[in-house]
A protein has these predicted regions:
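Basic/polar N-terminal segments that are highly enriched at the extreme N-terminus
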Residues: 1-3
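Helicase motor core with emphasis on the C-terminal RecA-like subdomain
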Residues: 6, 10-15, 19-23, 27-46, ...
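Walker A/P-loop
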Residues: 49
Length: 367
């Protein structure tokens, strides 16, 4: 599909079925089409993806989208292909035959938007496949991964400036929902987004349809009671977040004992299992998933009616990112933090393990 010279709003209607833009979407799109860099910091559910997808459709050339998660890029590519847009992804989940077919599509120009992780740039066969193409746009999704101050730091994200040079220094747009002032500065500096007429677009953090509450609890039994109550009350999908896999598994056993069906997602599962759980959740109409923070970045499912934190999140950025899964359809959704002061010990131990004192080093040295 090629819609060069089309007005952004016409592309919006033809390809995505909407008649008007939200927030500053059109301003951002026109800024990028004017060959200017951009950093977009805006709440989840506001449609940040359109800010690079529409320029990618309008521009002549190939748009490269860097995304941190394999499952996320698959969801976005599937959605674009359903709308008739020539998009693809290349990642480690593909077999050699499929991967070579997509490299061929890059070389012959039949692919308009390609999604990859930053680690893909280590592969010479990928960079060679791009070598003959005009790169019209580089989009960096979940851009907070660039910064060591960010809650999801990924080392290869810090090399994106090198990768951009390989691509011929195309116009770049970076997007995130969670970036403190320090993280914003890091993103701008690392990607040189202040060059020329680069601009930051900030949409605040307010999500008025999300109802936030904190419930003080004194035991796992009280936590279980709350989770069961929310599951029975709300029609729609829900996520319950846990810090520790062991606690997640304990609650899974308790919920099974109460006849409540659910999925489990955490970093201890094999990649194939994690992908299967995510696909089941994305297809479900009333599905509950118990998860650690390994689940969630980029999850784009409209009808998540509640997000419950069964214990205290590791950071305010993680909390905001995780509750941002809820209510993307604009309908009211409940976000509850179950506060038990004993849970603070878990994070205090994390801090201690990550910042050992001199006595600890001495003990290790003498072993």
């Amino acid at each position: 599909m090629l819609l060069a010279e089309e007005e952004p709003v016409k592309v919006l209607e033809k390809c995505f079925g909407y008649t008007s833009f939200l927030w500053k979407q059109e301003e951002i799109i026109r800024h990028v089409l004017g060959k200017k860099h951009a950093l977009v910091v805006a709440p989840t559910g506001i449609g940040k993806s359109l800010c690079y997808q529409i320029p990618a459709i309008i521009n002549d050339g190939l748009a490269v989208v860097i995304s941190p998660l394999i499952a996320l890029m698959k969801d976005q590519v599937d959605a674009l292909k359903r709308r008739g847009i020539d998009a693809a992804y290349i990642n480690s989940s593909l077999g050699r035959e499929k991967r070579e077919a997509r490299y061929a599509a890059l070389r012959n120009g039949s692919c308009r938007i390609i999604y990859v992780t930053p680690e893909r740039f280590r592969k010479t066969d990928f960079t060679e496949a791009l070598s003959g193409r005009h790169i019209s746009l580089l989009a960096v999704d979940e851009a907070h991964c660039i910064s060591e101050w960010g809650h999801d730091f990924r080392p290869d994200y810090t090399r994106i400036r090198e990768f951009r040079q390989v691509l011929g220094n195309p116009v770049t747009i970076a997007l995130t929902a969670t970036a403190t002032p320090e993280v914003q500065k890091d993103i701008i500096k690392t990607l040189c987004l202040d060059a020329g007429e680069g601009k930051m677009f900030h949409g605040g953090i307010d999500r008025p349809n999300l109802h936030l509450q904190v419930e003080k609890v004194f035991s796992n039994d009280e936590k279980l009671e709350h989770i069961i109550s929310v599951v029975n009350k709300y029609y729609g999908n829900g996520i319950v977040y846990f810090t520790l896999i062991k606690q997640l598994n304990d609650f899974s056993d308790m919920l099974k004992g109460h006849g409540i069906s659910h999925l489990c997602y955490h970093g201890g599962l094999e990649r194939v299992q994690r992908s299967k759980v995510q696909e089941q959740f994305m297809r479900g109409k009333k599905t509950l998933v118990l998860a650690t923070n390994a689940f969630g970045m980029g999850i784009d499912k409209e009808n998540i009616r509640f997000v419950t934190h069964a214990d205290i999140p590791g950071s305010i950025e993680s909390y905001y990112q995780e509750i941002g899964r809820a209510g993307r359809d604009g309908k009211d959704s409940l976000c509850t933090l179950l506060y038990d002061e004993h849970d603070l010990l878990t994070h205090m131990n994390f801090i201690k393990w990550n910042n050992p004192d001199a006595e600890y080093f001495q003990r290790v040295y003498h072993i």
